[in-house]
């Protein structure tokens, strides 16, 4: 459950932004580049959290 929650928390903002772009391509002008980059990088932090979660539950 913890891994699925971590995956969902990390990837949801990125996918929401992608779906928003799909329905409204003009949104790229309204959302700043740092926000786009943050969501993109936050999604790729998910594999970094997995060993931490595994280690925490292995104690």
From Swiss-Prot:
GO molecular function, one term: G protein-coupled receptor activity
Top-rank lineage group of the source organism: Eukaryota
Intracellular or extracellular location(s): Cell membrane
Entry's Gene Ontology cellular component terms: plasma membrane
Topology class, membrane: Multi-pass membrane protein
Cystine pairings recorded for this chain: none
Transmembrane feature ranges: 3-23, 38-58
Cell membrane in keyword set: yes
Residues in compartment: Extracellular: 24-37
Gene3D superfamilies documented for this protein: Rhodopsin 7-helix transmembrane proteins (1.20.1070.10)
Record-linked SUPFAM superfamilies: Family A G protein-coupled receptor-like
Cytoplasmic side stretches: 1-2, 59
InterPro entries: GPCR_Rhodpsn_7TM
UniProt keyword terms in alphabetical order: Cell membrane, G-protein coupled receptor, Membrane, Receptor, Transducer, Transmembrane, Transmembrane helix
Record keyword Lipid biosynthesis present: no
Family membership: Belongs to the G-protein coupled receptor 1 family.
Function: Receptor for gonadotropin releasing hormone (GnRH) that mediates the action of GnRH to stimulate the secretion of the gonadotropic hormones luteinizing hormone (LH) and follicle-stimulating hormone (FSH). This receptor mediates its action by association with G-proteins that activate a phosphatidylinositol-calcium second messenger system.
Protein name in UniProt: Gonadotropin-releasing hormone receptor
Lineage: Eukaryota, Metazoa, Chordata, Craniata, Vertebrata
Gene for this chain: GNRHR
């Amino acid at each position: 459950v913890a891994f699925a929650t971590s995956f969902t928390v990390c990837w949801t903002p990125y996918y929401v932004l992608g779906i928003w772009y799909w329905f409204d391509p003009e949104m790229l002008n309204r959302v700043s580049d740092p926000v786009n980059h943050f969501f993109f990088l936050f999604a790729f932090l998910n594999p970094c959290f997995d060993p931490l979660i595994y280690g925490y539950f292995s104690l």
